[in-house]
Amino acid sequence: MHLAYPAVLAALLFCVGLYGVLARRNAILVLMSVELMLNAVNLNLVAFDVWLRDTLHSGQALTLFTIAIAAAEIGIGLAIVLAVYRNRGTSAIDRLRDTAETDAAETLPDDAGTGPSGTDAAPNGDTTTATGRPGDNAGKNKKAEATR
């Protein structure tokens, strides 16, 4: 068997998967592209195992191990995407980069004065200490905002 055929096919599969990871914005499509890249690696492992005529067939054994890891990865990845979709209402990667911590920091005005005992008061009533840790009532206000 010529090694060039599966190697070229694996390179094409890997490039298509890499393009999908870099160009797609949907988290599920990114996971599918990662799986495509893993399948390209598996094809290379089997092709080189056959080409080298390894008596232990370590390439094929490693391929089985990689398939098991990929199955676990896609299961956990889809569970995370589903949980994020339920909480945020979207699975677009660009919209998921903003976390709640950066949103809270952006709501503070620049001229917010320092309150008593080294705390900063936010417009919504949340207080943070001088070290940046939330005060006692920060959790209560976040729950009230979530119910609105």
Curated annotation (Swiss-Prot):
GO annotation, biological process: ATP synthesis coupled electron transport
Region (Disordered): 96-148
Organism of derivation: Streptomyces griseus subsp. griseus (strain JCM 4626 / CBS 651.72 / NBRC 13350 / KCC S-0626 / ISP 5235)
Any one cellular-component term (Gene Ontology): NADH dehydrogenase complex
Protein name as it appears in the record: NADH-quinone oxidoreductase subunit K 2
Location(s) in or outside the cell: Cell membrane
Keywords recorded for this protein, A-Z: Cell membrane, Membrane, NAD, Quinone, Translocase, Transmembrane, Transmembrane helix, Transport
Domain of life (superkingdom): Bacteria
Key word Transcription present: no
Primary location: membrane
GO MF annotation terms: NADH:ubiquinone reductase (non-electrogenic) activity; quinone binding
Catalytic EC class: translocase
KW Cell wall biogenesis/degradation (keyword) present: no
Gene3D superfamilies associated with the record: 1.10.287.3510
Function noted in UniProt: NDH-1 shuttles electrons from NADH, via FMN and iron-sulfur (Fe-S) centers, to quinones in the respiratory chain. The immediate electron acceptor for the enzyme in this species is believed to be a menaquinone. Couples the redox reaction to proton translocation (for every two electrons transferred, four hydrogen ions are translocated across the cytoplasmic membrane), and thus conserves the redox energy in a proton gradient.
EC nos: 7.1.1.-
Gene name, Swiss-Prot/TrEMBL: nuoK2
Family, per entry: Belongs to the complex I subunit 4L family.
